[in-house]
């Protein structure tokens, strides 16, 4: 108690003068023996110098701790405050209960998770090359595992005999190589990306001047898919393919987009130049995977745009630079009409140069119908003007028949350019609507001024 009073005395200046200030108070010391409970008194003068030095050292240690306690406690309190703020922020944001995060700790089941991980081991990819004694209880399967070998194995608990066929990819376990699950065919991602997931916004009502062509294509594509019983009743096979040819801008690709919108079938769009690959055999492989993916669908429409990129007539230039392109075309010929049935697959092809296509590609059985997209007549051009001005802010007294008569030998793309230029004239004059004079100026600019850039006369020479 004496030492504690010395430490807490406010008039004490420090531990350096504790001995001189409180030495008279220490003349008589009373200490209690905690083992016996007796009180022992002795004179401080008889106390050893070492005991007094311990007292002063104890006082100096407490003072030093009090001196250094304040800065560390401030830092600790600051860090604790930041931690509390972050925890409160997390609770306010709801991250702890988010569906994308972990489940609450009370829902964790580490034992079952560990058991599940032990049961679900990764599988090896193999190819089932042969089935021994099919349709029996003792059926065995020959699987070829790449870089490992061939094995005769059975089925696992999760696989069904009706799901396994010869030539398909399967997943086998790493111990007994038993077939666990069937796998889908391996298809290049670049081929899968050719599938049009979203339906285009083009419809048949958005196409003008192609009424006859639309009817011919609908007979080949839509009628066999929507009413196959009509062909079964007559005992005939529907046409399998259509070739659309005509000058640029005549609406070939637009009709294909309208077909994709109209039918609920899977629509795959392929540009001919995409099948021209650097390495030998890559283009033919992509064609095989295209038709393989198309056969896996219930109904599919394959649209080859700019088919003249790979469908040109075969020739020998003595160098062999086009050999790979010709191999790709030969694969297309086989897929169109080979030993394997094409199934419910309709093929549309579009080109600007039908004169350079290989005759084997154009024969009946591969492309049964050829549809020519010629230049629209006066009625067709008038309809195209009305279609493109449907969403424009125009005056009511515009004579579209007059504008159509001023655009002879113009395609739908040319008329669309006229409508855009008329809108640009209205914007330049700071008007909110397009007048007939704007259309007349646009006709002079596009049809008359850009006549030297038009490729229509050049391409029309191939259709005469």
UniProtKB/Swiss-Prot annotation:
Keywords: ATP-binding, Cytoplasm, Isopeptide bond, Nucleotide-binding, Nucleus, Proteasome, Ubl conjugation
Cleavable signal peptide: none
Crosslink position(s): Glycyl lysine isopeptide (Lys-Gly) (interchain with G-Cter in ubiquitin): 452
Cellular localization per UniProt: Cytoplasm; Nucleus
Name of a matching Pfam family: PRS7_OB
UniProt-annotated binding residues for ATP: 246-253
GO biological process: proteasome-mediated ubiquitin-dependent protein catabolic process
Presence of keyword Ubl conjugation: yes
Similarity remark: Belongs to the AAA ATPase family.
Main localization category: cytoplasm
InterPro entries: 26S_Proteasome_ATPase, AAA+_ATPase, AAA_lid_3, ATPase_AAA_core, ATPase_AAA_CS, NA-bd_OB-fold, P-loop_NTPase, PRS7-like_OB
Subunit structure: Component of the 19S regulatory particle (RP/PA700) base subcomplex of the 26S proteasome. The 26S proteasome is composed of a core protease (CP), known as the 20S proteasome, capped at one or both ends by the 19S regulatory particle (RP/PA700). The RP/PA700 complex is composed of at least 17 different subunits in two subcomplexes, the base and the lid, which form the portions proximal and distal to the 20S proteolytic core, respectively.
GO CC annotation terms, alphabetical: cytoplasm; nucleus; proteasome regulatory particle, base subcomplex
SMART domains named among the record's database cross-references: AAA (SM00382)
Function text: The 26S proteasome is involved in the ATP-dependent degradation of ubiquitinated proteins. The regulatory (or ATPase) complex confers ATP dependency and substrate specificity to the 26S complex.
An example molecular function term from Gene Ontology annotations: ATP hydrolysis activity
Protein name: 26S proteasome regulatory subunit 7 homolog B
């Amino acid at each position: 108690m004496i030492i504690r009073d010395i430490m807490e005395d406010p008039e004490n200046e420090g531990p350096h003068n504790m001995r001189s200030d409180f030495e008279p108070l220490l003349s008589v010391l009373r200490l209690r023996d905690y083992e016996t409970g007796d009180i022992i008194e002795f004179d401080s003068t008889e106390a050893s110098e070492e005991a007094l030095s311990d007292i002063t050292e104890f006082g100096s240690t407490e003072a030093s701790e009090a001196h250094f306690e304040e800065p560390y406690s401030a830092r600790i309190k600051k860090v604790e405050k930041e931690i509390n703020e972050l925890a409160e922020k997390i609770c306010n944001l709801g991250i702890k209960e988010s569906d994308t995060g972990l489940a609450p700790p009370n829902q964790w089941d580490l034992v079952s998770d560990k058991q599940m991980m032990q049961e679900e081991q990764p599988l090896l990819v193999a190819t089932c090359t042969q089935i021994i004694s099919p349709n029996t209880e003792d059926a065995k399967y020959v699987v070829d595992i790449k870089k490992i070998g061939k094995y005769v194995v059975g089925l696992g608990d999760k696989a069904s005999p009706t799901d396994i066929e010869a030539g398909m990819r399967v997943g086998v376990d790493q111990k007994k190589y038993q077939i666990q699950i069937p796998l889908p065919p391996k298809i290049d991602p670049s081929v899968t990306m050719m599938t049009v997931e979203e339906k285009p916004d083009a419809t048949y009502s958005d196409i003008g001047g192609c009424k006859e062509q639309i009817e011919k294509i609908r007979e080949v594509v839509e009628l066999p898919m929507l009413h196959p019983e009509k062909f079964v009743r007559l005992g005939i096979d529907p046409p399998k393919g259509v070739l659309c040819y005509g000058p640029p801008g005549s609406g070939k690709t637009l009709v294909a987009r309208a077909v994709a919108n109209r039918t609920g079938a899977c629509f795959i769009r392929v540009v001919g130049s995409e099948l021209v690959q650097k390495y030998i055999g890559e283009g033919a492989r992509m064609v095989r995977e295209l038709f393989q993916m198309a056969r896996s669908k219930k109904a599919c429409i394959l649209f080859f745009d700019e088919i003249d990129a790979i469908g040109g007539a075969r020739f020998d230039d003595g160098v062999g630079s086009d050999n790979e392109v010709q191999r790709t075309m030969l694969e297309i010929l086989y897929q169109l009409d080979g030993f394997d049935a094409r199934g419910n697959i309709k093929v549309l092809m579009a080109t600007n140069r039908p004169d350079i296509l290989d005759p084997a590609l154009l024969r009946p059985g591969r492309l049964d119908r050829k549809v020519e997209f010629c230049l629209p007549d006066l009625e067709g051009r008038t309809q195209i003007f009305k279609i493109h001005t449907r969403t424009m802010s125009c005056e009511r007294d515009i004579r579209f028949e007059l504008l159509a008569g001023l655009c002879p030998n113009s395609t739908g793309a040319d008329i669309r350019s006229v409508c855009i230029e008329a809108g640009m004239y209205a914007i330049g004059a700071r008007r909110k609507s397009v007048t007939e004079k704007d259309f007349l100026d646009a006709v002079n600019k596009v049809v008359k001024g850009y006549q030297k850039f038009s490729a229509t006369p050049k391409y029309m020479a191939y259709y005469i």
